[in-house]
Amino acid sequence: AETAFLDILGIALASSGMEFGRDAVALACDLGMGEEASVLGSDHRLPAPNAALANGTLAHGLDYDDTHAESVIHASACVVPAALAAAEAGRKDGRAMLAAAVAGWEVLVRLGLVCPGQFHDRGFHATSVCGPFAAALIAAKLWGCPAEQTANALGLCGSMAAGSMEFLTDGAWTKRIHPGWAGHSGLVAARMALRGFTGPKEVFEGRFGFYNLYIGKGGGDRDLSRLTSGLGTEWKTLQLDHKPFPCCHFTHAFIDAALFLREEHRIDPAEIDSVECRIHPREMPV
């Protein structure tokens, strides 16, 4: 968990000097200033949801943040900014923040493991679709929400989960902002629950629940038991893959292969006419 925090902090600081990073911070400031939480790489302080928006965008914008491979979710870009903002707003210490973050990672990854890859198959970015639930859970834990309010916060997230993969067509910035928007939505949901708003209790498995909406009623291959299987004993947080290269994990094996060929066989790139890469069919659209 500490390694993931350090990884995200470093990436966010690197992003803060980029055009998209400056624009993300400016946007978060435009939405309202405050004293609750810090923006990484600046001296701005914002309401917690706005800080999560800025920091989540900084965390993901360079495509250098970690991935949980099987669930295909960029977990830490959602979890760490939400935990930082919620902990600051709730004046909690680092130990409490880490505990809440681990809870967020465990739930976030399991949401994707119910139907690995199937959000992407339907054009949804699993990171941003599942991310609000993790952020809401983190905030609920740090802000002292009892079970009923926590359930309401998660229920409210069912109406906040969103994220289109259309950015793959033209390289739009929407991918960069997805974890930030997820964090913002989750923290708002937790705050709504604290104010008495209610959310549907069967937000995941209900007839109009999360999985029926996003992978289709009766469609897809889903296993809802994976939401709780091994919870508290089998730590998905330990399965996060940190990136050696700032690009999609799907490309890393080919980069490794190219580097190996260069180092071991001294191949001159000018001698290469073409390269054939064999990939899983699910990776083709990406």
Summary of predicted features, one role per range:
Residues 1-238, 281-283:
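N-terminal core-entry segment
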Residues 230-276:
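A conserved active-site cap/scaffold subdomain adjacent to cofactor or substrate pockets
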